[in-house]
Amino acid sequence: FLNGRQALGVKSATPGHEPVVEISSIDQLYPPAGGVLHLWRFVFTPNANGTLSVPELAGTLRAALDDCTGLDERLGALGYDPAAPEAWNSHRFTLTQRDLYLVGPGFPRLDRNAVIPLPDGVSHLRFRVDLALAAAMRLGSRAEEEAALRHFLEDA
């Protein structure tokens, strides 16, 4: 997500996976020019009594949006129909972990200057980052998380 000079990457996982995130492009771990990039990793545990479900999250998002067309198109592409949410209610989750990282010098990532331009015949580059090696970049307190999110939302 991009808001002015603030960027926020979001990754999700289920329990049992090491703290590794998949990065879909070389530029995904670079902030906008003169800006800041945070990476938020969420771990969701399947739980029949969990507080999170697609219909509830979709409803929350729809209530916050003036125009739901884009959201409905994206959810529809995944097979979700807001008129018939019952099939999705059985998939419930509990948020069991969240970690926010400041991505910058010292964060494990590929150096874009080392691989750009890509060689002829190579059009995409995906890689994984072990967040255990980014522990020093992790924002540890709820106050730090809230400040980073507030800064992201307020920058334009």
Regions found by a protein language model. Give the residues of each.
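Hydrophobic/aromatic-rich core segments of domains that either
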Residues: L8-S12
